[in-house]
Amino acid sequence: MTTSAQILPLVKDPERLEARLSEIPPEPGVYFMRDGSDRIIYIGKSRKLRSRVRSYFREGYNKTERIATMAKLVTEIEFIVTDTEAEALALEANLIKQHQPYFNVLLKDDKKYPYVCITWSEDYPRIFITRKRQLGKEKDKYYGPYTDSGLLREILRISKRIFALRQRPQPLFKDRPCLNYDLGRCPGVCQQLISPEEYRKTVQKVAMVFQGRTQELIDILSEQMEKAAEALNFEVAARIRDQIAGLKSLTAEQKVSLPDDTVSRDAIALAGDAQHACIQLFQIRAGQLVGRLAFVAESHAEPGAILQRVLEEHYQTAESVEIPAEILVQHELPDAEILADVLTQLKGRKVTIFTPQRQVKAELIEMVERNAQYELQRMQKLGDRNHQATQDLAAILDLPNLPHRIEGYDISHIQGSNAVASQVVFIDGLPAKQNYRHYKIKNPTVTIGHSDDFASLAEVIQRRFRKYAEDPQLSRVGNPDWPDLIMIDGGKGQLSSVVTVLQEMNLLEDLRVISLAKRREEIFLPGESQPLKTDAEQPGVQLLRRLRDEAHRFAVSFHRQQRSDKLKRSRLDEIPGLGHHRQKQMLAHFRSVDYIRQATPSQIAEVPGIGPHLAQAIYDYFHPSHL
């Protein structure tokens, strides 16, 4: 078997690099950086493409470690020329959103701050709090990230009390609504007792709360209440009155003293150290603080450039009504006029961006900056603890470098049933939940009454690293997906099974793998019969313990979910041709599966949508001895 020659990075092929750079024009546009696997790893914009791209490869140019690493991986450069800088800015935002290049992740998605998600992609949208943005469904809308998860949950709780919303992701019963419907808390979504169109109107009202348009919603409801009262529809008027009272209670404590209370404005500021910048964005609508969002970025640029990138990423998914008329910034932005023009086009009205110098607006920026400083201090304390733990772990295991990415694996089952595995990831000592994975064990020898943790772990590791075994040329240096350390929950036996499979895949030399036994927190290394001599209270051991406990928690929760789904599954699901809608028709007619079992084919055929042929198939399913 032959393999294609590996493409050298451009930094190792000066002639090809210079030829490629000379092809790039000195015009505004967007550029792409690709690695040896043809993946887009970075997207940028510039008013002069050639000089900007050349700067990445210039000796002595002031580059951060992250950007220097990126430049070493680049094997191809592409570009798109635009007429104006504003067009380049808008195009860059769309392309970053589409491709999500690794080195473009300026805003760290460490799931520290929660979002509110509204699933507009569904007929009956759900509203829930999440710490992970799923980018696959463009119709779904995310609001946040919010700094105060407790306040966010309270707002959502009150919103669900004010408006009748679906309370469950899945129906509790197949043939009738649950108690929430009887209490007026849900309009009976599970039984489609409300049309999707009417329900979406209700959800849109809740969306206005998270868009900072609470006062606008109150005005709309007040007008509806007056019309209902004039029509002598006092029951509807009373319900709307209660909704207005609930909405006013949401904003009663959020008043901010500002001039021009009718003007919507955002205020953004940051506080940073050599590594990170903590950014706070306050959303003020009609004089009320309706949202306080937080971001974490790397401090590899000037403060104004960081603020601009945050604003670009924040507003690129915003609806026009969510863009404020004024944006107050702590530092001048490098391309403030261009960003203002882009936002003006999106909003359809004038948007201004400026740095306030005095009076109330300047005091507002100072308040936002103080909040950013408090968040930075909290983050530094946490970072010091984790840095100390990774240093200690590197010393314990004699690692050449601090372990940046550590992966932990665990197996969960009950006597072999519903066997699953977890893969959790810690980045610089912190859980990176966006990188978590779970696996359903496929090994046919793992069945009810017969568990095999060794074989299960071997299967999971093989599935995790299969692409690297199949393609030895796949880049590992600088690859964010490649772990610096693997920890297995278990003892010598579990570790041995993983070592064996990594040897078979020719990957053992490139991976450091250990196991952590629950008893006495013992660390085992490959080929060693005795555990390392460590103190259970050492920072490095405590880090491994946190990783092990998190892997166990994630595995157990997924196992419980699998068991719950299996228990909820109806016997009707096993009948070919009997979809969800027909199942609902059957249960509505017969009230239970037991009555369906007792019915004759002719009685089953009386159900709307069930013909004689399907009725016979249903009867035969419950009476196999009849065949």
From Swiss-Prot:
GO annotation terms (biological process): nucleotide-excision repair; SOS response
Sequence ranges assigned to domain GIY-YIG in this UniProt record: 26-105
CDD domains, per the entry: GIY-YIG_UvrC_Cho
Subcellular location: Cytoplasm
Domain UVR residue range list: 215-250
UniProt xrefs under SUPFAM superfamilies: C-terminal UvrC-binding domain of UvrB, GIY-YIG endonuclease, RuvA domain 2-like
A Pfam family that the UniProt record links to this protein: UVR
Its job: The UvrABC repair system catalyzes the recognition and processing of DNA lesions. UvrC both incises the 5' and 3' sides of the lesion. The N-terminal half is responsible for the 3' incision and the C-terminal half is responsible for the 5' incision.
SUBUNIT field: Interacts with UvrB in an incision complex.
Protein's recorded name: UvrABC system protein C
Gene name, Swiss-Prot/TrEMBL: uvrC
